[in-house]
Curated annotation (Swiss-Prot):
GO terms, biological process: 'de novo' pyrimidine nucleobase biosynthetic process; 'de novo' UMP biosynthetic process; amino acid metabolic process
Pfam family, one: OTCace_N
Gene from which the chain derives: pyrB
Organism listed in the record: Methanothermobacter thermautotrophicus (strain ATCC 29096 / DSM 1053 / JCM 10044 / NBRC 100330 / Delta H) (Methanobacterium thermoautotrophicum)
InterPro entries documented for this protein: Asp/Orn_carbamoyltranf_P-bd (IPR006132), Asp/Orn_carbamoylTrfase (IPR006130), Asp/Orn_carbamoylTrfase_sf (IPR036901), Asp_carbamoyltransf (IPR002082), Asp_carbamoyltransf_Asp/Orn-bd (IPR006131)
Protein name according to UniProt: Aspartate carbamoyltransferase catalytic subunit
Catalysed conversion reaction: carbamoyl phosphate + L-aspartate = N-carbamoyl-L-aspartate + phosphate + H(+)
Length: 312
């Protein structure tokens, strides 16, 4: 079906729908209600050159829930990268020890580069300001589980749309399903022109604004993102705009929408929102486990001809 997970643009609508159906089958295994040995004896290699909490831990959980194991690193300071070992050599080494590789890197294109070097499946867990396809799949899964559909949804993407790789991937995926989108950001953090051009060329309805009030009464999903401090070239400019959008209880309490966030949040969503029925971000984070379980099982067991084709 597919050999790697590098960019959401590599997937057709039917591919995404299939993955989401497989993810739903994984939910009782993800929660621990049922146990699986589908990837028993298999090893997932982890290459994390940037910090991660949810993505890394959910991949580890996903692999272990399927009966497999995990090796790798989350701190390059403890690897030979500090001695100057190249990305390609590190990937080749890890591919010899594992059945698939998950990589997060600060450089756009890093995941696709190593997919051309190694002979095991590669999953992009975020490449700079580029793509984050597995986050997009769990975002779509969250919408599908709540609304029962993705097509025809009205989604507002709010915050750092320039450097936020999650919104880059999500915008392309929503376009495949025919959802309409509103982009809410300061001018300096607007969605890149090439993405807007691609969406409009595909016939997608796109609205741009600096004001959340312009669109909040029109949307089903409020997808909020943090300002990417680590990618911001000017610390003073970051300090000036970091609080441009702040979602609190009064923002959403009486509105028929859900609030999503790829996390971590800084101060863009008040903790008082957490207890409201509109808050979906913690559930969204959990859905990373069944979605990534589905991907790992499809990539590893089907590619390697594993005898453990069944979930259990």
């Amino acid at each position: 079906m597919f050999e790697n997970v590098i960019s959401i643009k590599d997937f057709k609508r039917e591919d995404i729908e299939f993955i989401l159906r497989e993810a739903e089958k994984m939910e009782p295994f993800a929660s621990g209600e049922k146990s699986s040995s589908a990837l028993r004896g298999k090893i997932l290699g982890m290459m994390f050159y940037e910090p991660s909490t949810r993505t890394r831990l959910s991949f580890e959980t996903a692999m272990k829930r399927l009966g497999g194991d995990v090796v790798g690193f989350a701190d390059t300071g403890a690897t030979s990268a500090v001695k100057g070992e190249s990305l390609a050599d590190t990937a080749m080494m890890l591919s010899a020890y594992s059945d698939a590789i998950v990589i997060r890197h600060n450089l756009e294109g890093a995941a696709r580069y190593i997919s051309d070097v190694v002979d095991v499946p590669v999953i992009n867990a975020g490449d700079g300001a580029g793509q984050h396809p597995t986050q997009t799949l769990l975002d779509l899964y969250t919408m599908k589980r709540f609304f029962g559909r993705i097509g025809s949804l009205r989604v507002a993407l709010v915050g750092d749309l320039k450097y936020g790789r999650t919104v880059h991937s999500l915008a392309y995926a929503l376009a495949v399903f025919g959802a309409s989108m509103s982009f809410v950001s300061p001018p300096v953090l607007r969605m890149p022109d090439n993405i807007i051009h691609d969406l409009r060329r595909a016939g997608v309805e796109v609205k741009e604004t600096e004001r959340l009030d312009d669109v909040i009464d029109e949307v089903d999903v409020l997808y909020v993102t943090r300002i990417q401090k680590e990618r911001f070239p000017d610390p003073e400019e970051y300090s000036r705009i970091r609080g441009a959008y702040h979602i609190d209880g009064s923002t959403v309490a009486d509105r028929d929408l859900i609030v999503m966030h790829p996390l971590p949040r800084i101060d863009e969503i008040s903790p008082e929102v957490d207890s409201l029925p509109q808050a979906m971000y913690f559930r969204q984070a959990f859905y990373g486990v069944p979605v990534r379980m589905a991907l790992l099982r499809l990539l590893i067991s089907e590619r390697r001809g594993s005898e453990n084709q069944k979930i259990v």
